[in-house]
UniProtKB/Swiss-Prot annotation:
Organism: Homo sapiens (Human)
Post-translational modification: Autoubiquitinated in vitro.
EC code: 2.3.2.23
First-level EC class: transferase
Lineage of origin: Eukaryota, Metazoa, Chordata, Craniata, Vertebrata
Biological-process GO terms, alphabetical: DNA damage response; ISG15-protein conjugation; positive regulation of G1/S transition of mitotic cell cycle; protein K11-linked ubiquitination; protein K48-linked ubiquitination; protein K63-linked ubiquitination; protein monoubiquitination
Protein name: Ubiquitin-conjugating enzyme E2 E2
Biased amino acid composition, Low complexity: 46-55
Amino acid sequence: MSTEAQRVDDSPSTSGGSSDGDQRESVQQEPEREQVQPKKKEGKISSKTAAKLSTSAKRIQKELAEITLDPPPNCSAGPKGDNIYEWRSTILGPPGSVYEGGVFFLDITFSPDYPFKPPKVTFRTRIYHCNINSQGVICLDILKDNWSPALTISKVLLSICSLLTDCNPADPLVGSIATQYMTNRAEHDRMARQWTKRYAT
């Protein structure tokens, strides 16, 4: 009886001891594995991002130099501050249009994928236009599906100026203004001039 009792007593303490030893080893080893893996992952992500930023930043710097030396008619654009990816643009209402005399401010945001993805361009100044909504979003094909890396921000601004001269009621962003443009042009033009005077001068 005493021998059996001794075996029973010895058995748990031996297995318990080895189990504690295993646990201590696994606890000590696992954090090391967890620390090493994320570092490798972060390194890969940052190198890809750095390459994208380098490519896009060079292209944006080049376009900035070009638009500074030779800006499109009635347009100007450049970085808001130190961030090369955030620009502010000014467009003067085209002469002879219902927006003549207005000064319109736009925000331009380039992504790290530029020029392979279009810039985001929005009006900050309110404007009465069937292709520009109240949030300043512009319905322009080259800012969507017809974008090409061969295009530049200068060409985008020229296209926006053309849109101010000749709107596209066939592809409207604001249906009510497009309908008014086609059915009551005089009232449309009166409203557009009124908004220009109120918000853009």
